[in-house]
Amino acid sequence: MMEIGLNHYLVLSTILFAIGLVGVMRRKNLLMLFFATEILLNSVNISFAAISHYYGDLTGQMFAFFVIAIAASEVAVGLGLLIVWHKKHNNIDLDNMSTMRG
């Protein structure tokens, strides 16, 4: 039976990073932009944890927990701002964000 090694995790992480990057570049909906950013951050977490496990060091796993904490605070603040924006303007498209200036 085939063993799942470091390369498998890194390939998975690269695929998820590419999906998240395409999502960040192509999406106009702010909620989908948040989801794509979370996919990016979680792909980095997979890389940190896999490399950390491969070398037998816990540093990468600690970085992954730190990134999870930062991502959670980012989502809390971002979704709060998104809800306020939606209540005021009834949409969450990035094209309409230019009215926020001033």
UniProtKB/Swiss-Prot annotation:
One of its Pfam families is: Oxidored_q2
Give the membrane topology: Multi-pass membrane protein
Gene3D superfamilies the record matches: 1.10.287.3510
Residues that span the membrane, as ranges: 4-24, 31-51, 65-85
- Could you state one GO cellular component term attached to this entry? NADH dehydrogenase complex
Q: Which reaction does it catalyse?
A: a quinone + NADH + 5 H(+)(in) = a quinol + NAD(+) + 4 H(+)(out)
Keywords, alphabetical: Cell inner membrane, Cell membrane, Membrane, NAD, Quinone, Translocase, Transmembrane, Transmembrane helix, Transport, Ubiquinone
Extract the InterPro entries matched here. Answer: NADH_UbQ_OxRdtase_chain4L/K, NUOK/Mnh_C1-like
Q: Which molecular function terms from Gene Ontology are attached?
A: NADH:ubiquinone reductase (non-electrogenic) activity; quinone binding
Q: Which GO terms describe its biological process?
A: ATP synthesis coupled electron transport
Protein's UniProt keywords contain Heme: no
The main place the protein resides is: membrane
Name its cellular compartments: Cell inner membrane
Q: Report the EC number(s), separated by commas if there are several.
A: 7.1.1.-
Which protein family is it in? Belongs to the complex I subunit 4L family.
This molecule's function is given as:
NDH-1 shuttles electrons from NADH, via FMN and iron-sulfur (Fe-S) centers, to quinones in the respiratory chain. The immediate electron acceptor for the enzyme in this species is believed to be ubiquinone. Couples the redox reaction to proton translocation (for every two electrons transferred, four hydrogen ions are translocated across the cytoplasmic membrane), and thus conserves the redox energy in a proton gradient.
Q: How does it assemble?
A: NDH-1 is composed of 14 different subunits. Subunits NuoA, H, J, K, L, M, N constitute the membrane sector of the complex.
* Protein name in UniProt: NADH-quinone oxidoreductase subunit K
Q: Give the source lineage, highest ranks first.
A: Bacteria, Pseudomonadati, Campylobacterota, Epsilonproteobacteria, Campylobacterales
Gene from which the chain derives: nuoK
